[in-house]
């Protein structure tokens, strides 16, 4: 009943339940239907009475009363007159709130064009009329006439006439023979007279006939807009306005300031200009003013309306009194301060507070300390309610007084209220979901919030003055979600990689590490202890120390839960830690019977979580934290200057390196090496010296020393302890303190040749200090840029992935990805086990030896399976992936696999897209901003030899080797690899060996660890012959294409190929070497081509004409330096480049087909390369390659699809087009992982896959069939599949398309939801497009729902949606049943009523 009474007083309709929102162009009738009256005067309020002027911009008669239930003149007051319209002032008596809802309108004396449809590119009006924007503007702004009806004259339709031409035409043909108009009326006429169906049909015919690409594109664009208008029911002439709507006055308020001035919204100024000009125009028309004056006024009106809708889009920006541009309606929506991002996506909330945080080591993991004052303020409503319930107060006023006086009973009640009521803590910047967590508050004195030390990692908080915000979840549902989902105890694992995030750090690690150290010759060595009691006794009496080697008995339980014990060699410190381990058969003592570095502690917590569950883990973490702090305090580890050790050999190493650099300097002066080579060698030498000194220093720090007096082991070096345990500091920092600072970089990124030889302990010289300032300043500038860039990357990622939600359990996909271990420089960086853990197997995984099934198809791969897989040495596994998931909207749980933050299969409704975006974006701030500029050597080859990293047997993949005249094995293949297999035949290491390397091993040899496998010259790239014969030169003309340079010091001459194209005489030359037999015939290569080797500029000739060469001999060398120093984009810019799918600057050229390489006729400054396919049905493919680029293919080489013709970073689009989706996915995943791996950041592959899935959602139509699309359209992949299914059923022709890769920004703007796209970027463009097409937003994603103010369709909201769907389906069934049983209409009506009520 109550609700009904309240509804009487509520002027709004009940909150409608709706499923979608549509946007379209407003027709004049529509605008009038919204309006409550016309605004005729520009006045706002009367400056004396402060009452709104009648018919003005704030008119109470049109917009509603100023005070609740009171008319303007004060005749009718209070509720009883509700709904009456006062006869004196014409104001309706109602709530003043209607001034936020009621709109007005302005009738324009002349039509004006809507600037969005005119100027937002591509101009919709322009495309529709097939005129250029310039021409339309000439007509609109009264410069030219346009012919609308040519009649029988020689004029053409849409022809523009200047004033003079118009006069001449009138004289020539007479005024009534043709119609030419000017201004918006002209455009209105043209648009109103368009027959869209006919135009669409004509365009389709033209499209079918045209052959030129450009024309086709133009026609397609026009056809698209015409079809949009036809489908949406919009009329073209609505893009010209005759009526301007006026938004409600409370959305553009006029606020009195003190001192009698007013602050007003800019919109009021803009509306005033429109009204003034409109009224003036009306008056001029009534007065029959001269045409030129009226025209000028019309133009000014058009400009005023333009400024109102989008100020600054055309012409000068209209500024206010203080020279600041006025904010137009468009600006209200745009950007960070616009309606979408400021008020709809993020709002300020009440019941929140913020304060400084301090550490709370005595808290439990699920608690936080809340200052009493703060809690009192935050929980006020709850306290009032409780005071009332307990009878301490009868009114709110009384309760308020009690609370203000802070009476003792208030504190008791506060305690009750707070008990079991979680609060949310948030630290800005909230980069991932662990930046907001729920805690149970405990009341504390003081004014700072206490935070548990273990959650600092998740919040990225420290206690140097950080602040945190507290929010109170009010409703029961909110409290429930906070407790079940957001409690800190429920967030033990990191969503990005599944490793524990509640891990001790800094002091705690140091304490635990100290506790676990073993020392030699301590008192009591070799004693045996039966239990902890004895041990404690011995420790207290100093019979043993924490580090003594002892034997101790560790008690745990077996699988049945019966106590068992076992004796271990350990130390008292480790026994103390072992005492805290949960008693479980799967948690052995060995897990903490080792040096507890941060990594090992993390592994231990992970192990406990996997085997003992969440509750045990939380208790264990709390205990281990207490233990760590206690022993860090007891140990008292600190360091002074003497703890930084400078190695004795430093001076010697520095002297040796200086001698080397002097030698290089000499070689350069003698002309033996170039400037670049000298630079590379010097930088290399100093780099090696720094490393050597660091090694020596670390060896000194690690060394175990004994005290000569007591004979006991000396205390370990504390700097080393801190670094080695992972508590603080790194080898790099220790090197700078005690070794040598080493090489520094210039601001441009190049390395300065002179290093800093001193360290901080010795102190820097003035010059050294100056050199080091570059880096320091650049570091600061980088950090500032990085934060903004990283935040923007996260925002784009969230936007593209926000609608990837787990929406079903299994999509039944039969395709997936192949996972293999990632190998980098022979080292396995990511093992196959790490990569497949927590993913669903696509095919059964079989044991390679026994053939038994390890994991069945469709089961998730767990830790225990990974152990078996790793032992069995399986090298590739097919798994399900979000990329290949076939779910219509969202992703299915099977394809996604494990929810990393819980360690269980993912739940339905989990917003995996947002989690992926946060996991990738959050570490963004740790990535570097810099582009590496590396010298030739440093980038091309890091070393000049390869050593075996494992023992085993050698196998050569793609073996292609020959023995040269020195009897060495030489690699002739371009993609050959050396594999090292262990005894079981499992690949332990894979090394790529480059063309021209010398091999020291062959197939089947056994190698020891550290044995040399191959070596090569790092500074040159060889050109070798494959056949034995005699050398002959072609086109190597002295002075033109070859020059001899003599070395002054040695007198040795070398012949170098010079740029022959620089002289006119040499333009046709093709410098090459050919190998002939004795008879002088050119020899053939194994692949069929001639033995002719083309030489590029700067090649150094290694043989003389007529020399006899054997296969594998080098005939020329190309200095690596000429493979100009490349910039390697690294860090954040590289990640952004990959996600935006940009083409890299010097991108690789990839072969599109298998075939043979042939050299075609050269182009001006490009080489033409043709690939002749092995298969005759395919056309040959041509590539043009810039001539000076280093290029390693020879005529006649056989090339495979996907091989690189020109090295560089490949463009992702090429990979997609040539090798397909799977290759693209693995390329993007590996490249992005590479960047993060360098920084030591772990991110699970599936997150990157989810984002790549969102980038691959569109296909480009190639064959339209009967789909109604136009070739070149971008359509959702799933949408096309649905349409095709329907067409096949109807027996029509389906369409087909190729997948397209869109960058994340593009993909976000192309989401089906226009609300989401508009709130992302380019708001006006998105809304214009959506309005023309009459787009429908079905509110599928998260952002749209947040904006319209509903629960998001993920998590708990996802469940509600599902239940609602089931309920509606049931209701329909019931209605159908009833309809069948009772034919009576009344029953049906009643039922419909019932159902509606139920739905509400």
Swiss-Prot record:
**What GO annotations for molecular function exist for this entry?**
DNA binding; DNA-directed RNA polymerase activity; magnesium ion binding; zinc ion binding
The organism sits in which domain of life? Bacteria
CC cofactor: Mg(2+); Zn(2+)
Q: EC number(s) of the enzyme?
A: 2.7.7.6
- Catalysed reaction(s)? RNA(n) + a ribonucleoside 5'-triphosphate = RNA(n+1) + diphosphate
Annotated SUPFAM superfamilies: beta and beta-prime subunits of DNA dependent RNA-polymerase (SSF64484)
Entry-linked Gene3D superfamilies = 1.10.132.30, 1.10.150.390, 1.10.1790.20, 1.10.40.90, 2.40.40.20, 2.40.50.100, RNA polymerase II, clamp domain (4.10.860.120), RNA polymerase Rpb1, domain 3 (1.10.274.100)
Which positions in this protein are listed as binding Zn(2+) 1?
Answer: 71, 73, 86, 89
Q: What InterPro entries does the database record attribute to this sequence?
A: DNA-dir_RpoC_beta_prime, DNA-dir_RpoC_beta_prime_bact, RNA_pol_asu, RNA_pol_N, RNA_pol_Rpb1_1, RNA_pol_Rpb1_3, RNA_pol_Rpb1_3_sf, RNA_pol_Rpb1_4
Residue sites binding Mg(2+) per the record: 462, 464, 466
Please give the SMART domains that the UniProt record associates with this protein.
RPOLA_N
UniProt: Zn(2+) 2 binding residues: 811, 885, 892, 895
Looking at the keywords, is Metal-binding present?
yes
Pfam families in the record: RNA_pol_Rpb1_1, RNA_pol_Rpb1_2, RNA_pol_Rpb1_3, RNA_pol_Rpb1_4, RNA_pol_Rpb1_5
List the GO biological process terms. Answer: DNA-templated transcription
Q: How does it assemble?
A: The RNAP catalytic core consists of 2 alpha, 1 beta, 1 beta' and 1 omega subunit. When a sigma factor is associated with the core the holoenzyme is formed, which can initiate transcription.
- Which family is this protein grouped under? Belongs to the RNA polymerase beta' chain family.
What name goes with this protein? DNA-directed RNA polymerase subunit beta'
Name the species this protein comes from.
Brucella ovis (strain ATCC 25840 / 63/290 / NCTC 10512)
UniProt lists the gene as: rpoC
